[in-house]
Curated annotation (Swiss-Prot):
Name assigned to this protein: ATP-dependent protease subunit HslV
Main location: cytoplasm
Assigned GO CC terms: cytoplasm; HslUV protease complex; proteasome core complex
Species, as recorded: Helicobacter pylori (strain ATCC 700392 / 26695)
Gene3D superfamilies attached to this UniProt entry: Glutamine Phosphoribosylpyrophosphate, subunit 1, domain 1
Binding positions (Na(+)): G165, C168, T171
Assembly and binders: A double ring-shaped homohexamer of HslV is capped on each side by a ring-shaped HslU homohexamer. The assembly of the HslU/HslV complex is dependent on binding of ATP.
Entry's EC annotation: 3.4.25.2
Keyword Isomerase: no
GO molecular function term, any single one: threonine-type endopeptidase activity
Similarity field: Belongs to the peptidase T1B family. HslV subfamily.
Catalytic machinery residues: T5
Subcellular location as annotated: Cytoplasm
Annotated InterPro entries: ATP-dep_Prtase_HsIV_su, Ntn_hydrolases_N, Proteasome_sua/b, Proteasome_suB-type
Amino acid sequence: MFEATTILGYRGELNHKKFALIGGDGQVTLGNCVVKANATKIRSLYHNQVLSGFAGSTADAFSLFDMFERILESKKGDLFKSVVDFSKEWRKDKYLRRLEAMMIVLNFDHIFILSGMGDVLEAEDNKIAAIGSGGNYALSAARALDHFAHLEPRKLVEESLKIAGDLCIYTNTNIKILEL
């Protein structure tokens, strides 16, 4: 279900300055064929104050993006309130409960994974989250690099996604990154 991509979100503080980034690869796979190598699966929302990315069915993900963006607008960009209301709406709607997609949403203060079942998961360290077929590779690499390498945030996201792209057949190294 969640094959064909890797999305990595990373937030924190460096030199007393907050940062938030999201990155993703560009591969789209249909069965055992790569049909696109440069897709964009990340975007900024609410006047560039929130970042998001998706893994899973593209059509389902765009439905989730639209719904989340509408709720985020109604909550005036409050990410925490938006993910809670998003989860409530998702669970109420029988159609949404069948969508095969996951999202990461983050800002300078929070990072969340929105699961295909309507769950809201805050990243364990409130710093790094990853989804998709290469998500565990990217998450492991990002945690190690964050702990030991002391890289600039953009470089950490890029290198973590490259590692995932080298290991996961559904992920490539055509990486796109957005930052707040």
